[in-house]
């Protein structure tokens, strides 16, 4: 009788659970994974080279398009690298706004992860629940930047503008009654800060709903417990960061270990796992949402009592006011030169990283003294996590590969760059 051999299966890049354009070549013995070989590059856009071809202040938008679920956190690392090279002092109010939106972004990312991860393993309802809250936070993005995704809100020296005094409201439509419209606009009568304050007050109830749906659900536990186990020591060797590292029991978080912005002035805890499996990583991310909610609450309280500037007064990076440009030729020239030629950084190199929702997102920037970088290297957390796919999937069933892709929380915008 002929010997039965392993067979090869192409998973993706059109698979709905591939989270973008992942192509996995799976070597399978029956239904057990013997080898998983990720093929990347299908979303490569040459971002690093594009950033090197434009003035520093024209490349902020490229950062949003890396991990397109965690937009403002990407911007923060790039902006901090430029500010460190320029030696600019950022106003405290701008720092608090940045931290608040970093944490809003973290919740946005984790809600997207929770909804899609649940959908991947068969929990349909959680997707709808997660997007209910996500919509409110996307509205906060829209209120400050005009964009629901690619905000380009952070600028070297501060932020684009202060928080608006009026929250945008839903308009009358033939699809909704006056009563429905009134209910939808109930918490939008005040400022953006009032809206966020209302959100952080109600959000713990939403997290409890997610908990009730999933945490003790026996099918959810059967699909996640003991799947994709990575020990603490092995996680460090593989270069894991963020929830992937903390899920293995390592309490490493840049917000605590290497504080930036105003994180050292805020109170929050770092959740860690025990066994390093997919279920532990789920619990870590759930607790991270609670901690982010607590941080946002502290930021809102501080911002409500401390008005002030949100942009540095350094004319090298700060554009003139729109009203000044209407009647002052020098202001018009200043604006034109700033947004066409940008500014030059002194020669040198810098690495700045932030605690991104997926891990350590870093920017390594080399300047040769020109108005555009000589070299930019983007350290994407998902790249190291995907590299461990073979190790995490080996010995598991084919259906568990979907769980492992979900627990890694990979987005190909940052991996392929």
UniProtKB/Swiss-Prot annotation:
PROSITE patterns: COMPLEX1_49K. NDH-1 is composed of 14 different subunits. Subunits NuoB, C, D, E, F, and G constitute the peripheral sector of the complex. It comes from Ruthia magnifica subsp. Calyptogena magnifica. The keyword Ribonucleoprotein does not apply. InterPro entries: NADH_Q_OxRdtase_suD (IPR001135), NADH_UbQ_OxRdtase_49kDa_CS (IPR014029), NDH1_su_D/H (IPR022885), NiFe-Hase_large (IPR029014). It is found in: Cell inner membrane. The gene is nuoD. Coiled coil: none annotated. NDH-1 shuttles electrons from NADH, via FMN and iron-sulfur (Fe-S) centers, to quinones in the respiratory chain. The immediate electron acceptor for the enzyme in this species is believed to be ubiquinone. Couples the redox reaction to proton translocation (for every two electrons transferred, four hydrogen ions are translocated across the cytoplasmic membrane), and thus conserves the redox energy in a proton gradient. GO terms for cellular component: plasma membrane. This is NADH-quinone oxidoreductase subunit D. Keywords: Cell inner membrane, Cell membrane, Membrane, NAD, Quinone, Translocase, Transport, Ubiquinone. Belongs to the complex I 49 kDa subunit family. It catalyses: a quinone + NADH + 5 H(+)(in) = a quinol + NAD(+) + 4 H(+)(out). Its main location: membrane. Its EC number is 7.1.1.-. It is a peripheral membrane protein. The keyword Cytoplasm does not apply. One of its GO terms (molecular function) is NADH:ubiquinone reductase (non-electrogenic) activity. It comes from the Bacteria.
């Amino acid at each position: 009788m002929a010997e039965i051999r392993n067979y090869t299966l192409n998973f993706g890049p059109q698979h709905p659970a591939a989270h973008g354009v992942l192509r996995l070549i799976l070597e399978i013995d029956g239904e057990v994974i013997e080898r998983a070989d990720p093929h990347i590059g299908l979303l490569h856009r040459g971002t690093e080279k594009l950033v090197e071809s434009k003035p520093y202040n024209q490349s902020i938008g490229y950062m949003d398009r890396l991990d397109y679920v965690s937009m403002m956190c990407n911007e923060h690392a790039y902006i901090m690298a430029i500010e460190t090279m320029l030696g600019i002092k950022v106003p405290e109010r701008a720092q608090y706004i940045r931290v608040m939106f970093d944490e809003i972004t973290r919740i946005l990312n984790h809600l997207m992860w929770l909804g899609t991860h649940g959908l991947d393993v068969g929990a349909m309802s959680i997707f709808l629940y997660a997007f209910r809250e996500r919509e409110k936070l996307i509205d906060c993005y829209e209120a400050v930047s005009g964009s629901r995704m690619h905000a380009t809100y952070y600028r070297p020296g501060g932020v684009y503008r202060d928080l608006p005094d009026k929250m945008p409201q839903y308009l009358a439509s033939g699809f909704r009654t006056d009563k429905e419209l009134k209910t939808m606009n109930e918490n939008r009568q005040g400022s953006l800060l009032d809206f966020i304050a209302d959100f952080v007050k109600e959000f713990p109830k939403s997290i409890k709903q997610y908990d009730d749906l999933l945490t003790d659900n026996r099918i959810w536990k059967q699909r996640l417990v003991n799947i994709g186990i990575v020990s603490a020591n092995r996680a460090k060797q593989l270069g894991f960061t963020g929830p992937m590292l903390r899920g293995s029991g390592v309490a490493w978080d840049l917000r605590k270990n290497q504080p930036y912005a105003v994180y050292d002035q805020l109170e929050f805890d770092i959740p860690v796992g025990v066994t390093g499996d997919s279920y532990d990583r789920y619990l870590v991310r759930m607790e991270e949402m609670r901690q982010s909610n607590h941080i946002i609450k502290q930021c809102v309280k501080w911002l409500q009592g401390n008005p002030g500037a949100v942009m540095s007064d350094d004319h090298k990076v700060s554009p003139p006011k729109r009203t000044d440009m209407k009647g002052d030729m020098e202001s018009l020239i200043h604006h034109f030169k700033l947004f066409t030629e940008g500014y030059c950084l002194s020669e040198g190199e810098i690495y700045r990283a932030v605690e991104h929702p997926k891990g350590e997102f870093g920017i390594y920037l080399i300047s040769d003294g020109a108005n555009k970088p000589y070299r930019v290297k983007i350290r994407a957390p998902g790249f190291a996590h995907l590299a461990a796919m073979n190790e995490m999937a080996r010995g598991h069933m084919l259906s568990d590969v979907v769980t492992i892709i979900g627990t890694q929380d990979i987005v190909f915008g940052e991996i392929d760059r």
